[in-house]
C-alpha cells in the first residue's frame, strides 16, 4: 500500500534469491512492478463504498489505480535516478559498479531502473489516462473539492524529490512522512464515498469517519513497519506493540458498532483489525523471509477488505 513507497531508500542493495513457491514469485513481482499500491487503493476505495452501501462509477477506482501506479513508478524511478547519477550529471548505465549512493537502493528501485524504458512510458500513459478520466467524468464541483488533496499529494511528492531539499532543511515538512503518506492515501480512498453520502444512505458520514481514521492508522502502521524493517540504522522496533494496540482498539470499536446494529461498519473495522494483527505477525517473523518478500507481504496483508467485496452484502 499505501505504503512508504514514496519514502527515501535506506538499506543495502541486493536482489533477493527467488523463493521456490510460485505464489511468492507472483507476490514479489506484484510488488516490484509497483502494482501493490494501486491494488490496495482500489480495494480500500471499494470497501468504503461497500460499508456505506454506495455504488461507485467504474471510472473512479480505475482512475485512482492509474494515478497511484503512475505516482509510485515515478517515485521509484526518481529515487533510482538520483542514486545512479554519476558525478558528471549523466546516469552511469554502463558501469558495473554504480555510484556509491545507489548502494542504498532497494530491489524495487533496481528493478524499475533496469526496466526504465518500459516503466517511463507506462507511467506517462497511466497518468494521462487518469487525467483524461477525471476531465471527462468528474463534475466540476468534485474536481474543486478533490483539488485540495491532489495539491497536498503534489507538494509532498515534490518536497521528497526536490534536489535542493538538503540545502534547505528548515523548509522541510515537519509532519512525519509516514503519516503524510497514510493521510493522503487513505483520504483518496475514502473521499469518493464520503462525498456521496446523503441522508438516504444508511451509513452517515460521522459513522464512516471512524473506519476512515482506523485505516489511516493502519496505513501509517504499514509505512512505519516498512521504514523500521528497511532502515540501515533502525531505532527501537515498536511495531509489534503498536500493531497489537491498533488491533485491540479497532476490534473493540467494531464490537461497539456491531452491538449498535451497524454490521457493515463493524465488518470494515474488523478487516482493519485483521490487517494490523497480520502486520504484527509479519514483524515477529520478519527475519525468516527475504526483504522483497517481506515488503510485498506488508502490502498484501492490507487486502483483507477483499473478503467484504467477494461476499454477498448483508443488511444492517
Regions found by a protein language model. Give the residues of each.
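Short polybasic linear motifs
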Residues: 14-19, 87, 94-103
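Short, hydrophobic transmembrane alpha-helix segments
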Residues: 46-59
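Transmembrane alpha-helical segments that form the membrane-embedded catalytic/substrate-channel core
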Residues: 66-81, 151-164, 187, 216-231, ...
Amino acid at each position: 500500500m499505501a505504503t512508504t513507497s514514496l519514502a527515501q531508500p535506506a538499506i543495502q542493495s541486493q536482489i533477493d534469491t527467488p523463493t521456490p513457491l510460485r505464489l511468492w514469485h507472483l507476490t514479489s513481482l506484484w510488488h516490484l512492478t509497483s502494482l501493490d499500491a494501486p491494488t490496495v487503493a482500489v480495494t480500500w476505495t471499494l470497501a468504503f463504498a461497500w460499508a456505506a452501501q454506495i455504488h461507485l462509477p467504474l471510472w473512479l477506482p480505475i482512475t485512482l489505480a492509474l494515478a497511484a501506479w503512475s505516482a509510485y513508478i515515478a517515485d521509484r524511478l526518481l529515487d533510482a535516478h538520483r542514486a545512479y547519477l554519476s558525478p558528471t550529471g549523466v546516469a552511469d548505465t554502463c558501469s558495473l559498479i554504480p555510484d556509491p549512493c545507489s548502494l542504498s537502493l532497494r530491489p524495487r528501485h533496481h528493478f524499475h531502473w533496469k526496466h526504465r524504458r518500459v516503466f517511463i512510458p507506462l507511467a506517462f500513459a497511466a497518468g494521462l489516462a487518469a487525467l483524461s478520466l477525471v476531465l471527462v467524468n468528474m463534475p466540476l464541483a468534485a474536481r474543486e473539492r478533490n483539488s485540495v488533496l491532489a495539491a497536498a499529494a503534489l507538494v509532498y511528492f515534490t518536497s521528497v524529490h526536490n534536489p535542493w531539499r538538503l540545502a534547505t532543511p528548515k523548509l522541510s515538512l515537519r509532519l512525519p512522512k509516514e503519516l503524510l503518506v497514510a493521510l493522503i492515501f487513505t483520504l483518496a480512498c475514502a473521499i469518493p464515498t464520503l462525498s456521496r453520502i446523503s441522508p438516504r444512505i444508511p451509513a452517515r458520514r460521522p459513522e464512516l469517519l471512524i473506519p476512515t481514521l482506523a485505516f489511516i492508522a493502519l496505513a501509517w502502521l504499514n509505512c512505519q513497519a516498512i521504514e523500521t524493517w528497511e532502515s540501515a540504522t533502525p531505532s527501537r522496533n515498536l511495531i509489534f506493540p503498536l500493531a497489537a494496540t491498533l488491533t485491540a482498539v479497532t476490534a473493540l470499536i467494531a464490537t461497539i458498532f456491531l452491538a449498535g446494529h451497524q454490521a457493515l461498519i463493524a465488518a470494515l473495522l474488523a478487516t482493519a483489525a485483521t490487517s494490523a494483527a497480520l502486520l504484527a505477525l509479519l514483524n515477529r517473523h520478519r527475519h525468516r523471509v527475504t526483504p522483497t518478500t517481506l515488503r510485498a507481504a506488508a502490502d498484501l496483508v492490507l487486502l483483507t477488505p477483499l473478503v467484504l467485496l467477494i461476499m454477498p452484502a448483508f443488511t444492517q
